[in-house]
């Protein structure tokens, strides 16, 4: 049905699919897996006209800490998120992924500049690590040119 209707698939991931925090290995691993699945699924479904998007929220007010504590059989919450920002922006991103004419592949949704900055810096750090110390390393000018080409295809900020 999804192929026949040229529908949409939207998966909730996390910035933890890009970042890997201390003491969060299993959670980060699961989010990295969702990222890989979303990327593969998007490529697989592209020829069928099905759009696939990942929504990657940062830290918002949610029950994730309480839910994890219950699953582990403890009454102590792992993270009190009651003072965090409401997840309305995450819901808005899901709506865009499902209903805008040309959805983005990724919707990183963070509650503040800091979370956006550390996520982008981590992605850049991984790029640098991938590029160093092998026979096909690119120089700075080539990397900047590649980045400029990628930025030329990016959508403007809303």
Where are these regions (language model features)?
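A short helix-coil junction within the Rossmann-fold of NAD(P)-dependent oxidoreductases
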Residues: 1-6
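Residue(s) in the substrate-gating loop at a strand-loop-helix junction
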Residues: 14
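Active-site-adjacent segment of SDR/Rossmann-fold oxidoreductases
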Residues: 19, 40-51
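Active-site loop immediately N-terminal to the catalytic Tyr-X3-Lys motif
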Residues: 19-25
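Active-site helix of classical SDR
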Residues: 30-33
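SDR active-site lid
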Residues: 47-104
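Short-chain dehydrogenase/reductase
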Residues: 85, 106-117
């Amino acid at each position: 049905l999804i192929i026949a209707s040229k529908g949409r698939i939207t998966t909730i991931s996390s910035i933890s699919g890009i970042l890997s925090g201390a003491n969060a290995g299993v959670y980060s691993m699961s989010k990295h897996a969702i990222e890989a699945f979303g990327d593969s699924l998007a490529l697989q479904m592209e020829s069928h006209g099905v759009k696939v998007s990942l929504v990657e929220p940062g830290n918002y007010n949610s029950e994730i800490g309480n839910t994890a504590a219950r699953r582990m059989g403890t009454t102590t919450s792992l993270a009190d998120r009651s003072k965090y920002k409401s997840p309305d922006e995450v819901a808005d991103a899901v709506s865009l992924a499902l209903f805008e004419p040309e959805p983005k592949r990724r919707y990183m949704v963070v509650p503040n500049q800091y979370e956006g900055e550390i996520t982008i810096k981590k992605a850049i750090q991984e790029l640098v690590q991938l590029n160093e110390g092998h026979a096909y390393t690119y120089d700075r000018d080539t990397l900047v040119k590649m980045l400029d080409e990628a930025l030329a295809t990016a959508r403007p900020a809303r």
